[in-house]
Amino acid sequence: QIDITKDDASDLLQEMISEMGGMDLYFHSSGIGWQNTTLDIDKELQTVATNGMGFVRMVATAYRWMAGNHKKGHIACITSIAGTKGLGAAPAYSSTKRFQNHYMECLSQQARMRHLPILFTDIRPGFVKTDLIAGNHYPLQLDAHRVAKAIVDAIEREKAIKVIDWRYAI
């Protein structure tokens, strides 16, 4: 287990890649967020540390490894529909998810410019019924098993962006 908010996270990922003998797919599923209408600064900064700095630390490490080894690779990340349509009750969460969307788009452009065979899949689910939102009253929560199947399908089909919420999938 790697704590992506720690400075050694990049080194730990590289060690894991070495132990496995390489990497074809980096799958990023890490994030935190709260409804924070009072703008509790600790919650806002923890969200930025995990969803912003931690995200960059890990995704950039995976990208650099794939680029440096000239391997065909695939970087798939669970972001959120909140990056597409901001949620006023969760400003840091929505903002960091938008950052993730753009960061992946930029790395995808860079890979094409450098003629690197690295694919990207930005997975944007809506509200998934998980422990992260347990006890809160989010509308139309998505079944976690169905979302998991949609994620696997998006990765296997090498989709660039996969919105998993019928309300936003236009």
Where are these regions (language model features)?
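Rossmann-fold cofactor-recognition segment
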Residues: 1-8
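Conserved NAD(P)H cofactor-binding loop of Rossmann-fold oxidoreductase domains
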Residues: 29-35
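Short alpha-helical oligomerization interface
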Residues: 36-49
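Active-site helix of classical SDR
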Residues: 59, 96
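Residue(s) in the substrate-gating loop at a strand-loop-helix junction
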Residues: 80
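Active-site loop immediately N-terminal to the catalytic Tyr-X3-Lys motif
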Residues: 85-91, 136
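C-terminal helical subdomain
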Residues: 122, 134-169
